[in-house]
């Protein structure tokens, strides 16, 4: 069965894999095919497969073992995930959520460059100064504060509320937490340099550069998360995780075209 519905593909793929497991196509103790083969068979991206496998792992059907692959450990769900209607951003796949942030926050940064004040710039510079003193960059409060302050620089508090909610609700997202279990605790996600590029564009009040810098920052985050978990899932990352129809074409950045 080839999956053609473009909406929430990883959920459809997870349902198909669960059906195969429950019907005995894959038995307890078996390994699922490598992700690249599932992606080719279903004609979907590897990030869709990654999110589907994470969903199966959260529900207790499979266990992803470092250097060994994806093992079937149960033919029935061990853990049921109930959607929390009060946490609308806590129920999405991690790469789906990052893609949404990339689309929204790159446009927020573009608009912020047209509205930013001297006070906004001073606050962003102070945040960066504090962030430089961090011992560990991952899950830093200063990372969150920078993104919120960029949104506040639009002079639209509703945009800042959206950014904050998308960020903070990750801690309630079982798929986001499961993905991070596969990341080495020693991994450093050095986002400070990316933030510097965003800040420089805002100082220049350059909307296009601000949009590109925010887009690239979240692209770097997606690539880091994908690459850092790939050893466990046994395949290499694509260069661009959501390459279809990108809002910003990074290859054209040097020419300044949109």
UniProtKB/Swiss-Prot annotation:
Q: Which PROSITE patterns match?
A: HTH_GNTR
What residues does the HTH gntR-type domain cover? 7-75
Any single GO BP term:
negative regulation of DNA-templated transcription
Keyword Metal-binding part of the UniProt annotation: no
The record, for CDD domains, names:
WHTH_GntR
Keyword annotations for this protein? DNA-binding, Repressor, Transcription, Transcription regulation
Residues within the DNA-binding region(s)? 35-54
The family database entries (InterPro entries) matched by this protein are listed as: GntR_C, TF_FadR/GntR_C, Tscrpt_reg_HTH_GntR, WH-like_DNA-bd_sf, WH_DNA-bd_sf
Q: What GO MF annotations does this protein's record show?
A: DNA binding; DNA-binding transcription factor activity
Q: Which NCBIfam families match?
A: PRK11523.1
Role noted for this protein: Repressor for the exu regulon that encode genes involved in hexuronate utilization. It regulates the ExuT, UxaCA and UxuRAB operons. Binds D-tagaturonate and D-fructuronate as inducers.
| Descriptive protein name | Exu regulon transcriptional regulator
- Species annotation: Escherichia coli (strain K12)
Q: Which gene encodes it?
A: exuR
